[in-house]
Amino acid sequence: MSEEMNDQMQVRRQKLQELIDLGIDPFGHRFNRSSTSSELKEQWDQFSKEELHEKEDESHVSIAGRLMTKRGKGKAGFAHIQDLKGQIQIYVRKDQVGDDQFNIWKMADLGDIIGVEGVMFKTNTGEISVKAKSFTLLSKSLRPLPDKFHGLQDIEQRYRQRYLDLITNEDSTQTFINRSKIIQEMRNYLNKQGFLEVETPMMHQIAGGAAARPFVTHHNALDATLYMRIAIELHLKRLIVGGLEKVYEIGRVFRNEGVSTRHNPEFTMIELYEAYADYHDIMDLTENMVRHIAQEVFGSAKVQYNDEEIDLESSWKRLHIVDAVKEVTGVDFYNVNSDEEAIRLAKEHDIEITENMKYGHILNEFFEQKVEETLIQPTFIYGHPIEISPLAKKNPNDERFTDRFELFIVGREHANAFTELNDPIDQRQRFEAQLVEKEQGNDEAHDMDEDYIEALEYGMPPTGGLGIGIDRLVMLLTDSPSIRDVLLFPYMRQK
């Protein structure tokens, strides 16, 4: 802590004690406010200075917020207070509020939470303001706010002390308001489509539903190892078996992996499943839902991201993964007939691969290393190889591939979906193949889930499923470069 900061805090604590000595509670209780700052402006800014003077008797208001500016000496002063909706100016005069309250006003510091009752007026410059009739200290701020002209310059401090970021950065506050609206519109859209929102466990006995490393925990009373969920998928598909034909869940998912501008150890996903649908139906649903959200929240289906206009309004491109790789690299994996040939092609095109990778893994590496970052406008990539899609249904025309798609926008994956595998015999074989991969060192391979296979053995209808990372979608729609910009409290390394 700097010496200047320490001095300011000492002065504030001295003021705190002075208030207590005067019998004033520096940390107040309830305050009855009539309006927010934006409501006052909307209601009263339409009137002229003279009209407001005539309406003074009917313009009595009460407002509360954080003291952001303060100026004036002697027997009067101006200030701006800030609430969630913005800022409004207040005017405090000694002959209006009385000696005792004006003394409290003089001791007020930037950052204090205050309540004001008064009437509306306009200054000579035309600024709508509240003329205080009474002034109440609601919470004494013992630490000074960041400098009003420079704010929080340290990006890491913004993430670690999000409350300061929200106080001083209007854009940051708006991002999180928009995040809430995005999720709300997602719910509205799905509910109108007849989907049922459900809740499923976050602690699993088996980590499944995605290729990811789980967080491991322990249940003391049961002496059992549990895994924080890496996906919502398998429980929702059990509900499809049970006859809940259209279900979704929005919730936290946990993956024990690296931290980056796109990854946080815990993040928010939506997964949904629709009986009697396939991945083509889910493509349509995804496109229509994202377009609807953008239109409802932002008023346009065309959004800006990193100086690029992203067109969510026009029909989205749909491209088989093999064709996407061929367009960029010239390699046609339809004509690759062995793992050995795929390995040779990887070496020729400088594709990094690891031991034990097969045809499908190598095709996926071609895509991720050469193609993915080129997909700026919304593009559905479909037909992923079976080796990397253990829960997706085989394509009936070419069993090397599955009826699966991923959505890419601005070079990033935003959704993953497929026609769900509902054959319990095939599913068991896929899990067994995953166990072999795990023995060979792939710690993201699936475990065997006997309970899930048993559920499939009772019969699951043809089903389309979808997963969307909500954080990445919010990044896209709010033009935020890092996932930390859209998480109120992102994971940060300990100091």
Curated annotation (Swiss-Prot):
Co-factor: note: Binds 3 Mg(2+) ions per subunit.
Principal location: cytoplasm
Presence of the UniProt keyword RNA-binding in the record: no
Compartments, record wording: Cytoplasm
SUPFAM superfamilies, A to Z: Class II aaRS and biotin synthetases, Nucleic acid-binding proteins
Residues binding Mg(2+) 1, per UniProt: E406, E413
Domain of life: Bacteria
PROSITE patterns: AA_TRNA_LIGASE_II (PS50862)
Catalytic activity: tRNA(Lys) + L-lysine + ATP = L-lysyl-tRNA(Lys) + AMP + diphosphate
Subunit structure: Homodimer.
Name recorded for this polypeptide: Lysine--tRNA ligase
Organism: Staphylococcus epidermidis (strain ATCC 35984 / DSM 28319 / BCRC 17069 / CCUG 31568 / BM 3577 / RP62A)
